[in-house]
A protein has these predicted regions:
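C-terminal substrate-recognition/cap domain of FAD-linked oxidoreductases
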Residues: 25-33, 229, 236-411, 429-430
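Glycine-rich, histidine-containing beta strand-loop boundary motifs that form or position
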Residues: 74-78, 96, 115, 136-137
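A short linear hydrophobic-aromatic micro-motif
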Residues: 71, 132-134, 250-252, 370-377, ...
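N-terminal flexible segment immediately upstream of the FAD-binding catalytic core
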Residues: 1-63, 80-109, 260-268, 316-341, ...
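FAD-binding subdomain of flavoenzyme oxidoreductases
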Residues: 100-105, 111-115, 119-252
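N-terminal accessory segments
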Residues: 1-38, 67-71, 300-320, 414-442
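Activity-critical C-terminal alpha-helical subdomain
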Residues: 178, 428-470
Length: 470
């Protein structure tokens, strides 16, 4: 229900303090903005934004919202690429930005942090003591957001596992306002029932994660390697060979398609061969161990047909090479294509090269708006996530942009079904609900709907996400 905005703001100020409730249009737009290429519309705006300081204030906000049947949309840092933080029914946007505590307990060998702290800050503080965060998402993303999606970013799943493998426990505020503790404070995770596993990956529909406890992982030694191929398909074959022939997996790795590499090289001042590029980061107990593993990656790449492959010995050059992907978007921008939308496809390993080939030529031979876009391909080596970013003129009308967005999402769904993929990086809700239903069936989807109703009988928390509203 809609409530009087002035009364809502006053009531919330009484719960969290006057300085932490925002009703100005700018703030409401800021907290509703997404990666969509067109402007936020009036129907997407919350009535107000609130920043509680702790789980008790969050509890009070949720109890108030239940009493008045006001929807609450959670907001960590706004880096969601599938629009879970965009309000679907106005109401309250609840930001966890003030939950930034961090305790590193070396005696117990875990760290505990507030859900709103940025991954970049945790990486920095852990690094000072020789530890590593097994979540390598954008440095501006929040820990709570990563855990709620169960994403680890660019890291290889088979090395460190996902957050569900490294989280010892959570503090969670339920949609009805109760605060619960889950998990363990010892290094042994609970066998059998452990409610932490229910909330990890639940994408914010069952409760608000307010605190995360994770195991400490020693910082590994690393060595980087790079290889240049004629096509991305050859990289796909190399990845398949890496697994089948039991090469030591890299802890991190990226590839960039032919089109994007050229601009990336120019931006970074690199004189590298034309074609596609793969870069990997191998780890080891010590530098010698890491170097041996990196040399194995060089051997793999050469065996798979790389034009050139070598160890990146110069740290400055290595930094530039990793930056090639970050600059790849300039390939579209130099053509005046500033609107963009990315998709994610996770093919099975035997069909990885096939999917890469299809995405390389995805705009060709079409009679839709996708045919008018420029597409570039990039992704992860180790975890087979392929991303294709579609760039198009920013002066397209909003209606035209919405049409191409729908076409791109439908394309992603078709490709995921074709290659038996999942939401490996970004999760499911809300815009991948049709994919989930088609992949797993209505019965599986209805189980999630019933869980949501059990935890949130008034459908207060992130209303519209499980329904697939975008």
């Amino acid at each position: 229900m809609r409530v009087n905005a002035e009364r809502l703001a006053q009531d919330l100020k009484g719960l969290v303090g006057e300085d932490h409730v925002y009703t100005q249009l700018f703030e409401r737009i800021n907290y509703a903005d997404t990666s969509l290429p067109y402007d936020v519309e009036q129907g997407d705006l919350p009535d107000c934004v609130v920043q509680p300081a702790d789980p008790w204030e969050i509890s009070e906000v949720l109890r108030y919202a239940n009493e008045h049947k006001i929807p609450v949309t959670t907001y960590g840092s706004g880096t969601s690429l599938i629009f879970g933080t965009k309000p679907k029914h106005h109401g309250i946007t609840l930001s966890t930005e003030r939950l930034t505590s961090l305790e590193i307990n070396e005696d117990h060998q875990w760290f505990e942090c507030g859900a709103g702290i940025k991954t970049g800050q945790v990486i920095k503080e852990l690094g000072k003591l020789g530890y590593f965060l097994p979540i390598q998402t954008q440095i501006g993303s929040s820990i709570g957001g990563a855990v709620s999606i169960n994403t680890l970013g660019h890291l290889t799943d088979n090395i460190f596992g996902r957050p569900v493998n490294n989280v010892l426990g959570l503090e969670v505020v339920l949609p009805t306002g109760e605060i619960i503790e889950t998990g363990s404070k010892c290094l042994r995770r609970a066998a059998g029932w452990d409610l932490a596993r229910v909330f990890i990956g639940s994408e914010g529909i069952l409760g608000i994660i307010t605190k995360v406890r994770m195991v400490l992982i020693p910082m590994p030694e690393t060595v980087d390697a790079v290889a240049f191929f004629k096509t991305v398909e050859e990289i796909g074959h190399a990845v398949g060979m890496m697994y089948r022939e039991k090469f030591p997996l890299p802890m991190d790795g990226e590839f960039v398609g032919e089109k994007a590499c050229k601009v990336g090289y120019e931006a970074k001042g690199l004189d590298f061969p034309e074609g596609a590029m793969a870069i990997t980061r191998s780890m080891g107990r010590d530098k010698e161990d890491a170097l041996r593993n990196a040399q194995e990656m060089v051997r793999l790449f050469k065996q798979a047909g790389a034009k050139e492959a070598f160890i990146l010995e110069d740290p400055e050059i290595a930094e530039k090479v990793w930056g090639v992907r970050e600059n790849a978007m300039r390939w579209g921008q130099e053509k005046g294509l500033k609107g963009y939308l990315a998709i994610e496809v996770n093919p099975t390993l035997p069909r990885l090269a096939e999917a890469m080939a299809e995405l390389t030529h995805i705009t060709e031979g079409r009679n839709d708006l996708i045919a008018q876009t420029e597409a570039y391909l990039y992704g992860h080596v180790g975890s087979d996530s392929l991303h294709c970013l579609f760039a198009f003129p920013y002066d397209w009308s909003t209606e035209k942009m919405k049409q191409v967005v729908d076409e791109i999402w439908n394309l992603e769904r078709e490709l995921q079904l074709k290659y038996d993929g999942v939401g490996g990086d970004w999760g499911w809700l809300p815009h991948r609900v049709p994919l989930f239903r088609e992949k797993y069936g209505v019965t599986s989807y209805e189980l999630i709907v019933k869980m949501k109703k059990l935890f949130d009988p008034n459908n207060i928390l992130n209303r519209g996400n499980v329904e697939g509203e975008v």
